[in-house]
Amino acid sequence: MTKFVFVTGGVVSSIGKGIVAASLGRLLKSRNYSVSILKLDPYINVDPGTMSPFQHGEVFVTDDGAETDLDLGHYERFTDTAMSRLNSVTTGSIYQSVLNKERRGDYEGGTVQVIPHITNEIKDRIKRVAKQATPDVLIIEIGGTVGDIESLPFLEAIRQFRKDVGRDNILYTHVTLMPWIPAAGEMKTKPTQHSVKELRSIGIQPDILVCRCDRPLSEGIKEKVSEFCDVPVEAVITSQDASSIYAVPLILEQEGLAQQVLKFMHLEQRRPDLTQWQALVHQLDHPSQTIEIALVGKYVQLSDAYLSVVESLQHAAVAQGIAVQIRWVNSEEIEAHGPDRYLADAAGIIVPGGFGIRGVDGKIAAIQYARDNQVPFLGLCLGMQCAVIEWARHIAGLEDANSAEFNPETRNPVINLLPEQQDVVDLGGTMRLGLYPCRLLPDTLASRLYPQETIVYERHRHRYEFNNAFRPLFLESGYVVSGTSPDGRLVEMIELPSHPFFIATQFHPEFRSRPNDPHPLFAGLVGACLADNGNNANHHDSTPAEPLVSEPLSS
């Protein structure tokens, strides 16, 4: 039978529940236990697909086309296990399902209430993942902070779940903050005590406490927390701040988190194999050199908006023994001041995805800069569409070329709506979403980057596509369409053979990169930057860059 581990958070938001859940998944998988992870989000949106990146960060897309929280990206990268739409649940999706049942008459005229109807729906979603994925352990992260009104139905549901599946099959882990007060010169346990008190008032007694802190917990502090929170002292786990999120599983392993989970759930204690993970973290901490790659976007004020792109660059860099420092470039600044001041000396340039016309001209200018100056370039989704517009305007002779998204009246819509999107009105969940095949053209850069493949599978999230009416003109002017849908109808990849490394994709390769298995396109970009003789590269051999992920861990 599947065992269930619930991960809650207290004191503050963004405390790192998602990283703790993903790290526990990694530790259990290293012991040959199968794992799946479910995120319960308390917001009323049905999914994050229509939310602003500034509000929510990146929207992570699964193989089956679900638009989900960025934590699912952490789950996939840490456990190397594909998630599905079942692994992401929001308050909005719960209420939508319950109201649909009410409209159909499923409740036979009964009064629909939070308890039992909403809580039962939440429990059913948890059981659905366990039934479909059949993992040895299902980890469930509850978004938000204990004490928030939005989380109450989820907390009540997981309280009831203990009775449904039996006490031996369930474990509650609470992630909390243990702040150091410099003026007092000591660590304070009171926030943790109050957070546990709040959780107990709901009827949940945590079995394990994971304490976020900036220094190790002393034995005295652990004893105090154990006494006041009624948790075994060995189940008070230190989660000290780390230079990289990938170091967190090793910290939690050293603290004995996995051993405590297995002990509580009466599962066999197995020896972990973390050899590859340890090598990954060692390489992260000891790069031979650092290169700087410019990421040109319009959401750069919030790096989480491009989280999977940043992580994919890091995976590719580690595999080649180096580090990558991101130069965050706001495309609107390029529009105002030109590309030279922002892109000079960058080893490479990435233009990632996005929506809307704001900042697009800056992205196009950055792409022209990369093309003219032979700087290695990778375009993703909107980045490919901007590359198409740039070529059309400056090489193919279509000076007014544009995307129908930005100018529906343009005479030369080199980017146009997909045929199946013509009559779509709703924005949420209606794009081309999920995993689709892409056929590679032989003897191209794309085919060299995927050397063993003729058909590759990548994840999509877009409504607009290359307009085939202009394909002959592009081919005649030197463009190469190196990847298409298997029927040849949809353009998925373009490249410039006259350039050292210029390739762009309609899909999102960043969603399939893994720490120990970097995506070929990102590996190719980093390799091209290293191969550059230094004309564009900015190397710092003696002083490594700051870690790519130095922000507080996302919840």
UniProtKB/Swiss-Prot annotation:
Pfam families (UniProt xref): CTP_synth_N, GATase
Single annotated GO MF: glutaminase activity
Residues that coordinate or bind UTP: 13, 188-193, 224
Keywords from the UniProt entry: ATP-binding, Glutamine amidotransferase, Ligase, Magnesium, Metal-binding, Nucleotide-binding, Pyrimidine biosynthesis
Highest taxon of the lineage: Bacteria
Region (Disordered): 536-555
PROSITE patterns: GATASE_TYPE_1
A GO BP entry: 'de novo' CTP biosynthetic process
Enzyme Commission number: 6.3.4.2
InterPro entries, sorted: Class_I_gatase-like (IPR029062), CTP_synthase (IPR004468), CTP_synthase_N (IPR017456), GATASE (IPR017926), GATase1_CTP_Synthase (IPR033828), P-loop_NTPase (IPR027417)
SUPFAM superfamilies for this protein: Class I glutamine amidotransferase-like (SSF52317), P-loop containing nucleoside triphosphate hydrolases (SSF52540)
Amidoligase domain, as annotated region: 1-267
Sequence similarity: Belongs to the CTP synthase family.
Role: Catalyzes the ATP-dependent amination of UTP to CTP with either L-glutamine or ammonia as the source of nitrogen. Regulates intracellular CTP levels through interactions with the four ribonucleotide triphosphates.
Other facts noted in the record for this chain: CTPSs have evolved a hybrid strategy for distinguishing between UTP and CTP. The overlapping regions of the product feedback inhibitory and substrate sites recognize a common feature in both compounds, the triphosphate moiety. To differentiate isosteric substrate and product pyrimidine rings, an additional pocket far from the expected kinase/ligase catalytic site, specifically recognizes the cytosine and ribose portions of the product inhibitor.
HAMAP family xrefs: PyrG
Designated name of the protein: CTP synthase
Organism, as annotated: Acaryochloris marina (strain MBIC 11017)
